[in-house]
Amino acid sequence: MSEIKTDDPKRGIKLRGADKTARIPIKVVPLQEKLKKPEWIRAKLPSRKFFEIKDILREQKMHTVCEEASCPNIGECFSKGTATFMIMGDICTRRCPFCDVGHGRPNMLDPDEPKNLAESVKAMNLRYVVITSVDRDDLRDGGAQHFADCIKAIRETSPNTKIEILVPDFRGRLDIALKILAETPPDVMNHNLETHPSLYRKARPGANYQHSLDLLKRYKEMMPHIPTKSGIMVGLGETDEDVREIMRDMRAHNIEMITIGQYLQPSDGHLPVLRYVTPEQFKIFEKEAYELGFSNAAIGAMVRSSYHADEQAAEALRESHGGCGHH
């Protein structure tokens, strides 16, 4: 079990927006004039199912990343009866200025969370669940055992539900984290590169591009039958060629599934959107991804890491278990 100090007066205080990004190496400078949001950036309105799921989540005291990160697809995904759960609280130890999740010193892990999560998955009757988390640099294993406990709990109560985990980078704790997650594997292993390495100091302070690539490569070597997946955002200052370079790097590290979506600025305290990639360019990226050998590519303005994850995974899982799916 991961251990942390219990007597920290700042524990549980959540910073957001400009308060959160005040101490990162490169300051967030708002654009003089914001880029106008193009007409293809549109989210669907929520249905009744959306509100039913919200009620279940509050009842179980669960956090979804859909809500915490202000995802534009929340209405559509909840209405389909799918959700991405965020475990280990809603306070992150990192200060990434593209992300709308709060920063601070997190609370103690909740030992009942795996059980509560499993009950939520069962109550929502999910056939596919994505589990992600805040970064927990305060824990000795980065939270890997808590991920494993959640996987075990869901397997017990919903054995037919497929599980994807979207993990943090386990900085400084990678060996132990990979060992734990190889002993209790998910159905899909996902870890996001987020952006081009030239933008890491600005967008992902505290993370390392090569470390993130190695995380997925090493896991694939340990667990060859588990599909690996990664995603990036566009609009932070990268070029089209930067995107192609990331795709090539992913394939060189045996990453099989990819997501690429448009970055949308959650508030003025976050990094500004420097470009809106057109639907035509997203189509070109999608074609290039399949040419590079990705088994599945979810690429488009409104795509997020777990958007249509169930459909994406169906293909990869068939292929990794000897099936013969096609795009």
UniProtKB/Swiss-Prot annotation:
Cofactor: [4Fe-4S] cluster
Keyword Metal-binding among record annotations: yes
Any GO MF annotation of the entry: lipoate synthase activity
Manner of cofactor binding, per the entry note: Binds 2 [4Fe-4S] clusters per subunit. One cluster is coordinated with 3 cysteines and an exchangeable S-adenosyl-L-methionine.
Positions annotated to bind [4Fe-4S] cluster 1: 66, 71, 77, 306
Record domain Radical SAM core: where: 78-295
Main location per the UniProt record: cytoplasm
GO cellular component, one term: cytoplasm
Location of this chain's protein in the cell: Cytoplasm
Classification via Gene3D superfamilies: Aldolase class I
Functional pathway: Protein modification; protein lipoylation via endogenous pathway; protein N(6)-(lipoyl)lysine from octanoyl-[acyl-carrier-protein]: step 2/2
Enzyme class: transferase
Domain of life: Bacteria
Residues where [4Fe-4S] cluster 2 binds: 92, 96, 99
Recorded catalytic activity of this chain's protein: [[Fe-S] cluster scaffold protein carrying a second [4Fe-4S](2+) cluster] + N(6)-octanoyl-L-lysyl-[protein] + 2 oxidized [2Fe-2S]-[ferredoxin] + 2 S-adenosyl-L-methionine + 4 H(+) = [[Fe-S] cluster scaffold protein] + N(6)-[(R)-dihydrolipoyl]-L-lysyl-[protein] + 4 Fe(3+) + 2 hydrogen sulfide + 2 5'-deoxyadenosine + 2 L-methionine + 2 reduced [2Fe-2S]-[ferredoxin]
Recorded family membership: Belongs to the radical SAM superfamily. Lipoyl synthase family.
HAMAP family: Lipoyl_synth
Protein name: Lipoyl synthase
